[in-house]
């Protein structure tokens, strides 16, 4: 029965993966092939068409089919993938000292920052390239393309707060129809010009690079557009598993993409003028409007997948303490991964809106797109090479055989796309720098605050002894919960409570929340308890980086384990609200300190983040100089 269930589940999961994982790379044929010719000013001939098709085929084969599907997807963190999971795996390597880990964290932050930039560009370029088919139908639509695109994307971002669980059921079938359609269009064109299939021979790519080296180099900056979204295979592994994603790639996605690219190449051999929009010029006139509708649906699905990916990455970064607390809303009672981050949603929407106004067309946006993709691929190659050597036990020669060719290939991609910096490539670069600065500043700022608190801290063991020997200590009925980052020192809120209220509660519970480097922690492993004396308890709560912390829920579990009666109305949560003050010192540069203080002031309340009832919270203020 279990085997039968797995057989039924595998096709269903594979279909679902199509709608989430492959939307981005699946819409690349709308613009990537044409952009390769126009950006590099390639003269259309049999040699150049075959050469570029061969480059596309072998780059996809090496970078996606081999590197991502065969190698990178092995790096699963309890089934989860993505740059944050990869970073968590790397930080477990015992041979790495703290200095090397800092460099790896920085590199992981670079990859995460660029993915955020990708989340801004993908919706804009996908939707614009889809609706540009309307201009093929009639030039009258030209002036309406931007308003239509903005309208579609506005609706997409507005619906995020309600969740996409209902619509998500249709993503897989729609994307399957999309891949079947683009594959069929390509096949029909190939039948008319069958010798186009010789592009599979790598000699065409080699000869193109030898005879026109600079043109081939520039073209590589657009060839990479055929691989945009390839990182989603790894990032979404936790949702669907390795096998469904691999099956979808090799059986449906890769064949459909290559058929369509070959079909576009065959069309150019028959009609070089079709380079203006070879994708839509493949479509028969009677099918043009249905295809535009299907392409728009596929583009919206691709955009949704990237938006969801950004939400997930931001949530993981918050749980791992790499970002300040933000409001995270769960939009589904069934699926834990269905979340909505309001602040990030509006940042994405405003950024996408201005991108469309600024660049106006998908061909202009393509210049901005490649930079983020290539640098992310380079970061992943470096990180996975370190993991293979340090954690998988690969010998140095095996790591070298993997790393050198892919570092060279990714290096060529980065160098080629860097030519686009002035014409639009600065956009993801600026976005990446801003996000990277925020990540590093928050991480460093938290370290400084933590060190300041520990410098003036009082060990909890000494405090309990002094309380026990003092006749002046007054205890009042009820339970007090104090959140603390270090369970071995007295929480600031407790000291302030004694200072101002002159009392302690009959039960004082110090709670420390830990985020593990695994996605989920089982309920039975959630809490660890220690009774220090009759008035003091220490509770450690453990969550994975994809769990949503719920302190009252975990506290009830702890009370049951201690055989205590749990009554939320008898519990007060004392939280220290730190007021940071900028000082001249060895911390951070003044502008970074001001940035950190601003982020600290605008974090969402601790009670919201840990799902503590606001009417049970007592905030105790304190000042910390940084």
Swiss-Prot record:
The chain crosses the membrane at residues 8-28, 44-64, 102-122, 139-159, 171-191, 196-216, 217-237, 249-269, 281-301, 339-359, 377-397, 399-419, 421-441. The keyword Zinc does not apply. It comes from the Bacteria. InterPro entries: K+_transporter (IPR003855), K_trans_C (IPR053952), K_trans_N (IPR053951), Kup (IPR023051). Its main location: membrane. It is found in: Cell inner membrane. It catalyses: K(+)(in) + H(+)(in) = K(+)(out) + H(+)(out). Belongs to the HAK/KUP transporter (TC 2.A.72) family. Transport of potassium into the cell. Likely operates as a K(+):H(+) symporter. This is Probable potassium transport system protein Kup. It comes from Acinetobacter baylyi (strain ATCC 33305 / BD413 / ADP1).
